[in-house]
Amino acid sequence: MLGSKGLSPTDLRGMTDDHLRVELKNAKEEVFKLRFQSATGQLAHNARLRAVRRDIARIYTVMRERDIGIRSVQEEVSQ
């Protein structure tokens, strides 16, 4: 997929909560920069913006799974 950093749900589930927060922060910063480039007409690949937004959604999904107890870090590592 164009623009994806390879953040598959499996990879995300193997990360610690702190690492997920760092990835989320980085992705949000990237979306901000991409939106600015899009507004000024400098964005070459519109698909990158979509891919980063999907990465953010994946990160939020994994974080929410942990919050409500669907999966825990230990469970994910053992699978």
From Swiss-Prot:
Keywords: Ribonucleoprotein, Ribosomal protein
GO MF annotations, alphabetized: structural constituent of ribosome
Source organism superkingdom: Bacteria
Matching InterPro entries: Ribosomal_protein_uL29, Ribosomal_uL29, Ribosomal_uL29_sf
Gene Ontology terms: cellular component: cytosolic large ribosomal subunit
Any one Gene Ontology BP term: translation
HAMAP family tied to this protein: Ribosomal_uL29
Family the entry assigns: Belongs to the universal ribosomal protein uL29 family.
Record-linked NCBIfam families: L29 (TIGR00012)
PANTHER family with a match to the protein in the record: 60S RIBOSOMAL PROTEIN L35/50S RIBOSOMAL PROTEIN L29, LARGE RIBOSOMAL SUBUNIT PROTEIN UL29C
Name of this protein: Large ribosomal subunit protein uL29
Species whose genome carries this gene: Tropheryma whipplei (strain Twist)
Organism lineage string: Bacteria, Bacillati, Actinomycetota, Actinomycetes, Micrococcales
